[in-house]
Amino acid sequence: MNKHERLDEIAKLVNKKGTIRTNEIVEGLNVSDMTVRRDLIELENKGILTKIHGGARSNSTFQYKEISHKEKHTRQIAEKRYIARKAASLIEDGDTLFFGPGTTVELLAEEVNHHTLTIITNCLPVYKILLEKQTAHFRVYLIGGEMRHITEAFVGEMANAMLEKLRFSKMFFSSNAVNKGAVMTSTLDEAYTQQLALSNSIEKYLLIDHTKVGKEDFTSFCQLNELTAVVMDYEDEEKVETIKTYIEVVD
């Protein structure tokens, strides 16, 4: 096994297991401890994994560092637009909707082209998009509170107090990661605000692209089997089938 093949095999092992110990790689590939340590450094420099005490952790498994709102706008744009169009087809005139934060939901806001809607959001970019469409019959409300600047979403006591009083026919939201049936985000504040909106919604639709499946983040705020359906792209059929073991995926 040459170096290129060895690096590829280590990357596959760590991505499959999430975390792996150095001695597992040594025994599995029949190479020296020093060779494995050098390989882990090289793979860490390439952004594939993160070295931890006694081994390594996959960067594709744990969303340990939340990326900026600006950077999210550059990732999986075609997939997100596909998801947004699918989600828009689920909206009917007369609906009262809650839109959560996220770039996919922002694209959904661009797709919405209905005559009579009431939309409530705690996300400033979503609100700005929808505000341009506001009419006497297309009403848009922004929930205020403490802003999380990385997502430009309002959370905290003020936002939650407003949400507790509201009811929605449908909720559309996204997440940073989905794994083993759990839907996850990066902070407890955002998780609690999402939970409140979910508890006050009749239909609940999660919008995720395939790269979110199999990852983990800091905290879960709901389970897939509590939702109405998931709207996602079909770039990775295996991940779609994984989601279908828990909940319907919109065709």
From Swiss-Prot:
Organism: Staphylococcus aureus (strain Mu50 / ATCC 700699)
The protein's name: Lactose phosphotransferase system repressor
Family matches, as Pfam families: DeoRC, HTH_DeoR
Role description: Repressor of the lactose catabolism operon. Galactose-6-phosphate is the inducer.
Name of the gene: lacR
PANTHER family per UniProt: GLYCEROL-3-PHOSPHATE REGULON REPRESSOR, HTH-TYPE TRANSCRIPTIONAL REGULATOR SRLR-RELATED
InterPro entries found in the cross-reference section: Carb_Metab_HTH_regulators (IPR050313), DeoR-like_C (IPR014036), DeoR_HTH (IPR001034), NagB/RpiA_transferase-like (IPR037171), Tscrpt_reg_HTH_DeoR_CS (IPR018356), WH-like_DNA-bd_sf (IPR036388), WH_DNA-bd_sf (IPR036390)
GO molecular function, one term: DNA-binding transcription factor activity
Superkingdom classification of source: Bacteria
